[in-house]
Amino acid sequence: MAIPQFFLLLVSLFHHAFAQDFPIGVTSPLATSCGPDNANVVCLDRYASVLPYHFFRRFSGGSTDISFAQTNVPHDTSFDLVGNADFLVFDQERGLELLGSNPTYDKVFNVSEAVHEAPVYVPSLNKLFLSILAPPAGVLQPQLVVDLNQDPPTLSEYFSDPPVYAPNGGTFYNGLIYWGASGGNRSIGGIEQVPGIQTLDPHTNKTKTLLNNYYGLYFNCVDDLIVDKTGAIWFTDPQYSWFNRLVETPPQLLTASYRFDPKTGAVTMIDDTIVQPNGIAMSPDGKHIYITETGAVTGSIVRGGPPGSPFNQTGPRAIYKFDLIDGGTHVTNKRPIWYAQDWVPDGIKMAANGDIITGSGPGVDIIDPYGVLIARIQTDYIVQNIAFVGEELTEMWLVGQGGISRVRWNLKGQDLAAI
């Protein structure tokens, strides 16, 4: 019996529609619960690199962030697991290894929507020091300390002596906290400050200014910093202090990254190609510098212009890797290794094995030294920075806008106290 022509057409159309919904290469389910039974872990098949049509992730812009977990994938309901997971694993072998047998994620403190930054762990006190950044300019905010000797940990406020205005980045070296002080005003708590580098002795609460100008010009916003084994300080200088009105003076310098030698007072530029250099870290072997680019979040530098720095999804938001040269005093061979899949890569820290950990939107990405995403921690607030704590350095604290959280896993952090 002959098959009617219109029936063959319907079959062809149905086959075409099915092929569009489920292209060759799609495996189902895309997402599965995995890892230890006690943890909320979800594994993605092959990075979800082939999604069934019609999928769609809405545009992020202004102050609105649409995360990967919010991608609409109507033809694979397993993707609904992604949004509720604490840990997303993209590389199952390495991801489950770094999580270990008993990973946990806990939101320990609810805090204000102000930016929380510069977490620094002091081993001798077993305390985590961090800062609050909030406009308007000249309003001195108390800093915070998490006492890890208490169970549960406690959060308290303090002012250093003299107080430091708006520490935006911090690290630990030779018994001292090193702060990138990002704010400036003619009178803050009765003293004058501009962006620069300061130290805090956590045992005496005394602070000291190490750097506050570039040949008479104000730095824009000393954002983040690291100290190498020689005592040299590497730091970034974007323009966020002006965008957020933590300073009174519009930018006087190009955004750039620098190396400062406190033994001599000399400051040398190491890079001026990044639109808004932000986080900075050095590999455990001392061979590479990593700098995060947050140029997708940029505002107006014009006096009288609108404050704030809206997000532009198509703007630059990468992590760059550099090689150290000239006896470890300069960098070369800049190359992008990671393009943030969510918001911008902000604070950055190193694991002992060389993996990179960066706060990025509502969560933290764990990336290998070549820019391959291994796993992600998901939060309900924007994470600005992270710090490893404890004797084994396998506990990590996340700080940001609205929350302070704790992760316990198998990934060990870089031992800053050993530098």
Positions of the model-derived regions?
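Beta-strand-rich domains and repeat architectures in extracellular enzymes and scaffolds
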Residues: 27-141
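Fungal secretory targeting signals
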Residues: 1-20
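Short loop/turn segments immediately following beta-strands, especially the blade-tip
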Residues: 146-150, 312, 321-329, 409-416
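Blade-edge beta-strand/turn elements of extracellular beta-propeller
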Residues: 91-110, 149-163, 203-216, 254-276, ...
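Short, conserved, GDST-rich strand-edge loop motifs in beta-rich repeat architectures
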Residues: 66-68, 77, 131-137, 180-192, ...
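Blade-level signature of beta-propeller repeat domains, shared across WD40, Kelch, NHL, RCC1
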Residues: 385-419
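Blade-loop segments of beta-propeller domains
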Residues: 115, 132-187, 192-196, 209-214
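Beta-rich, blade/repeat-based domains predominating
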Residues: 111-125, 162-186, 214-233, 240-241, ...
